[in-house]
Curated annotation (Swiss-Prot):
Pfam families: Ribosomal_L29
Entry GO CC: cytosolic large ribosomal subunit
Gene3D superfamilies hit by this protein: 1.10.287.310
Family statement drawn from the similarity comment of this UniProt entry: Belongs to the universal ribosomal protein uL29 family.
Keywords carried by this UniProt record: Ribonucleoprotein, Ribosomal protein
Highest taxon of source: Bacteria
Gene that this polypeptide is encoded by: rpmC
Protein name, UniProt field: Large ribosomal subunit protein uL29
Length: 63
């Protein structure tokens, strides 16, 4: 997910994207804790995407 794509979205769309990413992170965490997640790098990618979305939301809220 690119930052330019995120900046083009509205705050409502970003909040929906954030909720989806948080659900995805939860699912990956559960899979990792039960030993079912083979691609552990996905946790890091999702965590960083969450940070990106939160940063863009904060930037838009400040304007």
């Amino acid at each position: 997910m690119k930052v330019s794509e995120l900046k083009a979205k509205s705050i409502e769309e970003l909040n929906a994207e954030l909720l989806e990413l948080l659900r995805e992170q939860f699912n990956y965490r559960m899979q990792a804790s039960t030993g079912q997640l083979a691609q552990t790098h996905l946790l890091r990618i999702v965590r960083r995407n969450i940070a990106r979305v939160k940063t863009i939301i904060t930037e838009k809220a400040g304007k």
